[in-house]
Amino acid sequence: MRPLVHPALARVWRDPGTVQIGLNPSHAVVLTGLGPGEVAVFRSIDGVHDLPALRAIAHRAGGDPIAADRLIEILDGAGVLLDGDRVRPDDPDDALAPDRASLSLLTIAPAAREEPLAARRRAAVEVRGAGRIGAVIARLLAAAGVGRVSVADGGRTMARDVTPGGLSLRDAGVPRELALSAVLPEAADQRGRDPDLVVLAPTAGTARHDAVALLRDGVPHLIARVIETSGVVGPLVLPGQSSCLRCHDLHRADRDPAWPRVVAQADGQPNGLAACDVTLAAQVAALAAQHVLAHLDGFIPATVDGTVETSLPFGLPRRRSWQPHPACGCTWAA
């Protein structure tokens, strides 16, 4: 092993014997009281020197060679150390290098830090609905390294669908599904496979019928939409494990007996021109993509048993908790 301090973390010296690794308080580490030998060792933890070489560096600097072992142990325990032999060399043509570096900072297990994007590459995600929200979600997921991103949308692109990072004006009149398939990379080894997760980003209605079918088939799914001046991401439904959209409706009906009639009319009579602020749509799309990626990367997103909601004009998100409803039955077998 040739130890390497994580190259994505800043290294700043607070004084000659104190070094801070990382600027974000969630994972920053401060080492203090370092002597000349330890300082020399730290400056040489660069993925080139192995442990015997680091011990020799400590000795030449007038320190105890065992200081190298202690320093490596501390850094490894803090989760800021990589094995330089297993880190891919920096490639300026690697478009996913910033994403790989970011995710590796969130992952504790050293094995996962070595190739953090592997789970994304294996995944297949389908986005249903390719308006202002769904089109951006699809492109973000593809750009973040998801192996296969497919789009299902039977409509044609209109000027109102155009948004930065999604569909463009040159797509006007082209089927939305076709316009996006032209810009989404296709993984040959994943053609025809069922999706690991489906994102429901309806351009009209509430997508409840799709959600029911996906729940029945055991397919994880996430809802992302704008309702007038509010954006809602969630729930992320893990069939048999977390609350579903019907659970949410039952909780609402407990408080508002007319809620089922409201939902039925919202599904059956979508507005001709739905309000969808472009900045709100972008925020919803980004949040939805983040939660999909978090799920694929092995985290538990806040949209499991919950929704993340944001509203104009300020876009400050808040989480609402939605536990499984006892009358729903979607988790009874769990």
Task: Label every model-predicted segment.
Residues 1-334:
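Adenine nucleotide-associated cytosolic modules
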